[in-house]
Amino acid sequence: AAARQLADALGCTAVLKGSGTVVAAPGQIPVLNLTGNARLGTAGTGDVLAGLVAAHLAAGQNAFQAACAAVHQHGQSADDWPDGEALTAGTLARRLRV
């Protein structure tokens, strides 16, 4: 409910990152993304997510589509991360492609 309220109040697409990231936009049904894990709590990974949203926007998606795609890709990358390898914002950013 908070994501939808924020999106409606500001007239924007909102991403509330956490365990079960929510993407909401005016006139859209909010999307709950279940990919991702605690590794994304690392400093800077939210900045990587913001850059990934921007990359999807630059590729021609609308804001809601870009946010949904980026959130899923970001989370799936963490889920697929090799065991025993540290996930840092820098290594995450270098591995992502749009």
Task: Please state what every model-predicted region is.
Residues 23-26, 49, 75-82:
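Short active-site-adjacent structural elements
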Residues 42-73:
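Short, small-residue alpha-helix embedded
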Residues 1, 60-68, 82-87:
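Short, charged, surface-exposed loops that flank catalytic or proteolytic processing sites
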